[in-house]
């Protein structure tokens, strides 16, 4: 049986929906191998740690439960949905855990009359948040409030207050609410997450499964995690127990400073397995400040589609290191206006080297529209400095301007036998259409499929097979180990490095 492992955001849509995950009970043991001197120092340090009560008492009043109301139809409640998860159905009827969850079910379960009027119900989603100012600004996750029409927060003392949505930033999954009350609220400050080390203690506070004010502790497991949610991924991984409903809640260091905003977990079941992810404080602080001041986040925009530079790609273009960001498609934007083209590699921004595509995206996003930057660009085998005036990032980044082609080409097919490709001229004369691929070839391994269009080879336009073979010969003379194909698939550009076949 194959287990499905997935990332999930942590907002709980009603208490029953949040519990549609399996409960598992197990025990484990482990051994710590170390020298005596080191062990003594570690245990001595642990003995000095008197728990987290002092920190919790300091910061907990600033943490809130976020309730989101929506006009969407509420999911009907079924006892079988609620309790038939693996593990739960095996518990005795009098088991305290089963009784505990049954109490919650019965507490929130609507009556028969209200079920008959289900179209008038307004479902509630639960999440977490925290005050960052005495005048009522609250940070939470965008996915917590994204479907809402009205919002409320429950304070640590149980007081419920209405809140107003100030702004959201889906790209970083952050949002800001505001409570307008003539009182001062307890609040917390953002800390310096750059000082956070793997192995440092952290404390998470939130509203898992609607259980407000829940405190858990753990350590920093890793930094700079990319979990595939977007180009701005740069998560702090922690092993503190984090579950659905913890979304938007804070992660604190031992100084009581917010070092992260909990947003996702990695789990085979949907519940906590000790792998949670928090947005770094540095990112949250910058985004939140703009949301409060402007109601939105304005980012610098180059107007390019990019892909990673692999070792094979760097070899094919004569780049010493497999670093930077390869331009697959310059959209109609600032970069194209400055002369940046597909196949160019951005290797630095204002003199600072770029490691990868995420590095470039973050640096440009942290700049302001209208700002002029100097890009180090690897173009046609040499480095050039190009100045680009950034624009504002549009709402739709998926702008496409691809060539059209057909897979019907009669008898005009030509063969690149050494590379396992059969190609034909495209209908619009731009590139060569791949009509067949040898499944055992390097091209197939690199994901080239029939219907793809080879637009350029080593940044030179191709219209016939001889354009490719001539480029290969020139690359061999230069001692290159691979050729770089610009391939268009369904109007999306990418670059593929193919090893040069030596006869």
Swiss-Prot record:
GO molecular function, one term: serine-type endopeptidase activity
Gene3D superfamilies: 2.30.42.10, 2.40.10.120
Residue span(s) of domain PDZ: 286-357, 419-466
SMART domains with a match to the protein in the record: PDZ
Top-level EC class: hydrolase
Entry annotated with the keyword Cytoplasm: no
Active-site residues, as the UniProt record annotates them: 143 (charge relay system), 173 (charge relay system), 247 (charge relay system)
Disulfide bonds: none
Record-level GO BP terms: proteolysis
Sorted UniProt keywords: Hydrolase, Periplasm, Protease, Repeat, Serine protease, Signal, Stress response
Signal peptide: 1-18
GO cellular component: outer membrane-bounded periplasmic space
Statement: the UniProt record of this protein carries the keyword Protease: yes
Binding site for substrate: 245-247, 302-306
InterPro entries: PDZ (IPR001478), PDZ_6 (IPR041489), PDZ_sf (IPR036034), Pept_S1C_Do (IPR011782), Peptidase_S1_PA (IPR009003), Peptidase_S1C (IPR001940)
Reaction catalyzed: Acts on substrates that are at least partially unfolded. The cleavage site P1 residue is normally between a pair of hydrophobic residues, such as Val-|-Val
Subcellular location field: Periplasm
EC number: 3.4.21.107
Stated family: Belongs to the peptidase S1C family.
Protein purpose: Could be efficient in the degradation of transiently denatured and unfolded proteins which accumulate in the periplasm following stress conditions.
Protein name: Probable periplasmic serine endoprotease DegP-like
Source species: Bartonella henselae (strain ATCC 49882 / DSM 28221 / CCUG 30454 / Houston 1) (Rochalimaea henselae)
Phylogenetic classification of the source organism: Bacteria, Pseudomonadati, Pseudomonadota, Alphaproteobacteria, Hyphomicrobiales
């Amino acid at each position: 049986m194959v287990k499905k492992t997935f990332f999930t955001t942590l907002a709980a849509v009603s208490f029953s929906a949040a519990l549609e995950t399996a409960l598992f009970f197990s025990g484990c043991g482990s051994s710590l191998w170390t020298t005596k001197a080191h062990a003594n120092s570690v245990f001595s340090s642990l003995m000095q740690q008197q728990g987290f009560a002092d920190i919790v008492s300091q910061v907990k009043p600033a943490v809130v439960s976020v309730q989101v109301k929506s006009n969407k139809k509420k999911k009907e409640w079924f006892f079988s949905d609620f309790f038939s998860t693996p593990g739960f159905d095996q518990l005795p009827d009098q088991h305290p855990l089963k009784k505990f969850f049954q109490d919650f079910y019965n507490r929130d379960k609507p009556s028969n009359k209200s079920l008959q009027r289900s179209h008038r119900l307004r479902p509630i989603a639960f999440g977490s948040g925290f005050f960052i100012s005495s005048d009522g600004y609250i940070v939470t996750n965008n996915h917590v409030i994204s479907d809402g029409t009205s919002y409320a927060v429950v304070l640590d003392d149980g007081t419920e207050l209405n809140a107003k949505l100030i702004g959201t930033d889906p790209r970083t999954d952050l949002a800001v609410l505001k409570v307008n009350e003539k009182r001062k609220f307890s609040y917390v400050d953002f800390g310096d997450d750059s000082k956070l080390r793997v192995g440092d203690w952290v404390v998470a506070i939130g509203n898992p499964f609607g259980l407000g004010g829940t405190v858990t502790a753990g350590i920093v497991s890793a930094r700079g995690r990319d979990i595939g949610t977007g180009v701005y991924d740069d998560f702090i991984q922690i092993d503190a127990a984090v579950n659905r409903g913890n979304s938007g809640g804070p992660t604190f260091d031992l100084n009581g400073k917010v070092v992260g905003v909990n947003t996702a977990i990695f789990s085979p079941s949907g519940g906590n397995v000790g792998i949670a992810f928090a947005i770094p404080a540095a990112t949250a602080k910058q985004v939140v400040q703009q949301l409060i001041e402007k109601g939105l986040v304005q980012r610098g925009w180059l107007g390019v589609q990019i892909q990673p530079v692999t070792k094979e790609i760097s070899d094919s273009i004569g780049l010493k290191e497999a670093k930077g960001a390869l331009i697959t498609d310059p959209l109609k934007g600032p970069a194209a206006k400055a002369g940046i083209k597909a196949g160019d590699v951005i290797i630095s921004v204002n003199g600072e080297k770029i490691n990868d595509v995420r590095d470039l995206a973050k640096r440009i996003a942290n700049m302001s529209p209208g700002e002029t930057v100097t890009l180090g660009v690897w173009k046609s085998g040499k480095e050039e400095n190009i100045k680009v005036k950034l624009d504002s990032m549009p709402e739709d980044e998926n702008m496409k301007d691809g060539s059209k082609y057909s897979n019907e080409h009669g008898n005009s097919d030509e063969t690149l036998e050494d590379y396992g490709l059969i190609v034909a001229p495209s209908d619009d004369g731009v590139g060569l259409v791949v009509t067949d691929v040898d499944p055992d070839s390097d091209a197939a391994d690199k994901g080239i499929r029939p219907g793809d269009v080879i637009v350029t080879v080593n940044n030179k336009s191709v219209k016939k097979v001889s354009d490719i073979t001539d480029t290969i010969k020139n690359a061999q003379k230069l001692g290159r180990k691979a050729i770089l194909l610009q391939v268009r698939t369904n109007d999306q550009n990418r670059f593929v490095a193919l090893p040069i076949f030596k006869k």
